[in-house]
Amino acid sequence: MSSSQQSGRANELRTPGRANSSSREAVDSSPLFFPASSPGSTRLTTPRTTARTPLASSPLLFESSSPGPNIPQSSRSHLLSQRNDLFLDSSSQRTPRSTRRGDIHSSVQMSTPSRRREVDPQRPGVSTPSSLLFSGSDALTFSQAHPSSEVADDTVRVIWGTNVSIQESIASFRGFLRGFKKKYRPEYRNELMPPPDAEQLVYIEALRNMRIMGLEILNLDVQDLKHYPPTKKLYHQLYSYPQEIIPIMDQTIKDVMLDLLGTNPPEDVLNDIELKIYKIRPFNLEKCINMRDLNPGDIDKLISIKGLVLRCTPVIPDMKQAFFRCSVCGHCVTVEIDRGRIAEPIKCPREVCGATNAMQLIHNRSEFADKQVIKLQETPDVVPDGQTPHSVSLCVYDELVDSARAGDRIEVTGIFRCVPVRLNPRMRTVKSLFKTYVDVVHIKKQDKRRLGTDPSTLESDIAEDAALQIDEVRKISDEEVEKIQQVSKRDDIYDILSRSLAPSIYEMDDVKKGLLLQLFGGTNKSFHKGASPRYRGDINILMCGDPSTSKSQILKYVHKIAPRGVYTSGKGSSAVGLTAYITRDQDTKQLVLESGALVLSDGGICCIDEFDKMSDATRSILHEVMEQQTVTVAKAGIITTLNARTSILASANPIGSKYNPDLPVTKNIDLPPTLLSRFDLVYLILDRVDETLDRKLANHIVSMYMEDTPEHATDMEVFSVEFLTSYITYARNNINPVISEEAAKELVNAYVGMRKLGEDVRASEKRITATTRQLESMIRLSEAHAKMHLRNVVEVGDVLEAARLIKTAIKDYATDPATGKISLDLIYVNERETLVPEDMVKELANLISNLTVGGKTMLVSQLLTRFREQSSTRLDASDFEACLGALERRGRIKVITSAGHRIVRSIAQTD
């Protein structure tokens, strides 16, 4: 056998089904081959391959260097057992995973567990695994950063259609991983005295942490590539040709990880690294493109867009490698998927058989990867006036699946793709218009000026996956944590934080304190022994009062910093818009469930303006949301329960645009008592005429137009929005206070004390001044107050402040204008019963006194007849019963039943 035949045989054993055709004549005959202008100059060539297999024509398939004719037969047989699908190595302990990324449609083969180890010529005695195996060329392998003279020639090989040189890209990125330091970043360049960590090798440290923690994802800041001088070209190539550069970076990570092991590493550690599939996830591009600005020039390039997640599909199995078996002879063959297409074998490749149309797809032997489609929409703040928001489809794969939920504000980095659309699903004729989508390689959630999502609303597996794989903006550094802990020890931290919340709004201290505690929130609890599986820790607040009292401004400020917040108006919202609605998917034509405002706000705060303008049908769905924090949907055959674990901040205007202090709150706002009672705090914001207060308010507003900082605030009195959100996020994520025994006793005493406010000296008038909902609200507010002080135990002072806030709110909105006393009957009982005119009650009391003189009694029916006779207007029986009940509660009369008749007696006659 000749040397060329042995070399070809070796190549066939290494990569079955791929021929060796990388001769010099084939290279010189390439249409892209340019002869050098001088004999000593470098020639630029593009390697050509044969089309023996569907994948052999790919521009990224290069054949590894031939092992030569003098390979021992034992080495060949061992290589055969590793590479051929029909032979299994008895020493292998685990099945390797698919080495192809779902987000990168590249035919570059990633490293496998059975990679052949080669000796690094620069480091004798150190065994390093070989790099990518390419078919159809004698190009260098990825592990050979310094090619030997035997293989190197005077040509520069680039990937077809690009200016990407594989060896140059490997060397450049390897040098970046090994040499990039913090001092190259822009924030370190302007420092006269660089900090101690300026010489830190950022990515070497990250790779070491990945090996220790067993991670496979490296988040690459693209700006680091740009500011590192040797990799500026690689930065532009990554932007223009991400499909070719990212697989090279993936393999380089594994090679550097192997280099970091040092001399003679343990075999188990070496095998563990070989079995892992390392992936690079670039982010932080220089420019974030608007969705409506995407154009055909961005196709197959790396882009970055921001938006709001509207819908996430279930996990879709995406086939990566198809397994076919001949139904005649049983011969098996695997075919890799290229951009969603399967090159199904027409005939059996076995020469002995050669049966046509006999290859069957075996699903349980095929390889699948996780895939999910996300619908991303423009955020309302970037939509131009008079236009509807644009949306784009995102395809996420592998670890990024289920990393984003409906309602998340995310920034994604990915490759802009386009695919043809068939004119008819059963025909291959396609339209001239292409459908576009984004293959996501990185997801960055939230905003620096927004709070972090409540971790208690995340499932444990999703939260763990997000913590490991997703780059969170709201990660707080150690320096910020130290500053937060120092600030929390200040005695006036409560006042400073409340002033920092909407500092442009004058005073309203108690309202701001209530909103501040709403942002911190209570603790969500689940008791397996309790009647309810979950007790809410979210706080609901309603602001009602006169117009032009800054209610809407407060809502917008809270919406800007609230996590997963949705801002909506009562008049422009419907029941399905708040909960969920059924729509037909444009791709699958199936009915899908779209999330509404309350479901999108899961784990955040939903701000509803003009709450009183809502229709009754829309308000009725809020009863379940505000107490059970779920939304039950039964539409079009879809029956499900969605989570709506959200705090509600609402504002309402009174009837007639002016609050009447002579009427109770239910008569002023036109809200049902059942809905009003579900708010933890109800604040009345009234526009009272006061010359001194008006002058101070006017001076404050004028000063806001003259300077950005309020007149009464200094740098030490008001925190910035970034620090305020960092403080609240740290408290929400790390502090889970527990009620102490002293605090529990104080809660009981405060509740009993609030109930005693309804007692009268005559011990017969029973006004409701507190219910168990006030007790639960007190618990939530006290937990939020403890969170604000970064305490893990609720103390007595927290309970006292919570009780003070509740009493202050109740004093304003639950005071009976007729008696001037606090009575929750105005809210919890029927409206007609509580709104009986006081003069009618007095007239009935006088009539009873006159008719029961001398200890006489009177039937209720007779009393109603006499009362109607002297009344000038038609008197309903319900109004009469309401007056009778009011007199009985006040201790004026007593109604008894005797022989089936109701009898009225004066209370003075019964004592």
From Swiss-Prot:
Gene name as annotated: mcm4
PANTHER family: DNA REPLICATION LICENSING FACTOR MCM FAMILY MEMBER, DNA REPLICATION LICENSING FACTOR MCM4
Originating organism: Schizosaccharomyces pombe (strain 972 / ATCC 24843) (Fission yeast)
Chief localization: nucleus
Known role: Acts as a component of the mcm2-7 complex (mcm complex) which is the putative replicative helicase essential for 'once per cell cycle' DNA replication initiation and elongation in eukaryotic cells. The active ATPase sites in the mcm2-7 ring are formed through the interaction surfaces of two neighboring subunits such that a critical structure of a conserved arginine finger motif is provided in trans relative to the ATP-binding site of the Walker A box of the adjacent subunit. The six ATPase active sites, however, are likely to contribute differentially to the complex helicase activity.
Region Disordered, residue ranges: 1-132
Keyword check for Nucleotide-binding: yes
UniProt catalytic activity: ATP + H2O = ADP + phosphate + H(+)
Protein name in the entry: DNA replication licensing factor mcm4
